[in-house]
């Protein structure tokens, strides 16, 4: 027997028993985003490597350690580690944002070569939202309200907490960086080699360290909010006022900086403790300089992304009222001379006349006992039964699989009217 081939570590299959929950979550995402007037876009999963180096920052962990990169002839290409850079590239390339505002969203797989752990994998799926051309804090508030509405639709709103911060302008961050480095240089004995490297290359990333001793030291570190420029401070204060007005609770987290270099002003995360250690469900912020950095006109921008794997785990943990199996409504069984053709015609008629119902046709043979076992296993509400006598009499037997009336016989011409009364 040939040796079987396994999935690559950190890249997982989604089983038939798991996909209904994914589909339900994705449907809630689409419904909420469409209700706010956002438009879906689709980008390639492979981009030119320099796109991410320029957008995310060469000293970030993502670019320096985690990207899947390869050569195609003389061009270096990368499996996308996130969606914002590709969306900005597409917006510039196709002129979507020239003298125009856009509210866009996308969904799809991303790739990072990091240590797989619960809810975080090397191939993972993200929903991303990007807004171009709006500078005021009202759009910051709208994105946060949009995510909160999605949490309510998913039944997880009581299990997530909003954390906010402002990281100001590039100049304000540079001033803060100097103050932070000056403070941390006296505590290098508490740092790992990786943290010492971050102190030199990207010191703001030390603020979200998991090192408990260093976390205690950081409680007394300079606060980024104390170094904000006046414009960023006013922007942040207005955002907080808008959230207060609509009743969205938040915590100001002065250590929140996000992991990518393109952010400025507002940054936010929705976090949860329902999965054990506190983890991020959704994160985003402003990146007003990124469009120009990638060759476009100066364009104020903001966005967020949420990981679907982490979201699936959270919904499973806290919301018992979610679908756990495919929604088959009607299962058609048949046996005997002439029954195959009638059953096929019946199944197609139901699909045509009642397209909102999911109709499964038994195609693997066997006696009625075997077929009804399959029908029960499918979770269908009704079975439509065609045997030799039903073929001769132009009838169909309706069997209730989830309790209620046991079964009844109807003329085939009346079956659609009957099904409309049942669903």
From Swiss-Prot:
Please give one Gene Ontology molecular function term for this protein: histidine-tRNA ligase activity
Q: Quote the Pfam families the UniProt record gives.
A: HGTP_anticodon, tRNA-synt_His
Q: Which compartments is it annotated to reside in?
A: Cytoplasm
Does Cytoplasm count among this protein's keywords?
Answer: yes
User: Per UniProt, which keywords does this protein have?
Assistant: Aminoacyl-tRNA synthetase, ATP-binding, Cytoplasm, Ligase, Nucleotide-binding, Protein biosynthesis
Give the chief site where it resides: cytoplasm
EC number assigned by the record: 6.1.1.21
Which reaction does this enzyme catalyse, per its entry? tRNA(His) + L-histidine + ATP = L-histidyl-tRNA(His) + AMP + diphosphate + H(+)
Q: Give GO terms for biological process.
A: histidyl-tRNA aminoacylation
Q: Which family does it belong to?
A: Belongs to the class-II aminoacyl-tRNA synthetase family.
Q: How does it assemble?
A: Homodimer.
This protein's name: Histidine--tRNA ligase
